């Protein structure tokens, strides 16, 4: 067990390391032992430890250091023989209240949650979560909830609170909105979708409009989680 919470995230093993994918309380950094990497410049194959990967929130050394031409060839994961389910995510905790589920049961539950909340990329064009969940100081969060008392925050235990970008966007009235050929998913406000003929420019314009609205209403600056290749 160890990666069941990451079930149904589309992509490849190398991309999982590059992005430090995460969902439902688990990130790849929690289970990665090492990665074999090809340095195209020197032709050398190197082994990167977990520490060498310099993981951050949806980030890694492979993402921040683009000057080096590196290809992730293979990854080694450290999984647990004894099942220790991570039920920190509220929906999972509710589903398994008073029970210790198996890794397979958690996997099936995560798949069910994802299918209900997120459009599948093969059916509706999207890149998953478009924005990162912002983190602010606890003192700033206290000020924020004095104006928005129903706003949820997740204490990080280090003097900061993580907010739900989806909740911020939804409270601004953007869930399910469309702009021409693109829009915000009606299933999850953090997912921007292409209904078939949308362009990169339309998606980026939509993202900019959402960022501006959230900034105006909450004073929060949303950062993209997706990586834009090239430019409109």
Enumerate the predicted regions with their spans:
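Phosphate/pyrophosphate- and phosphate-bearing ligand-binding catalytic cores of soluble enzymes
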Residues: 45-201, 217-232
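A gly/ser-rich beta-alpha-beta helix-loop segment of oxidoreductase catalytic cores
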Residues: 3-34
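A short, local hydrophobic-aromatic micro-motif
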Residues: 1-4, 33, 46, 73
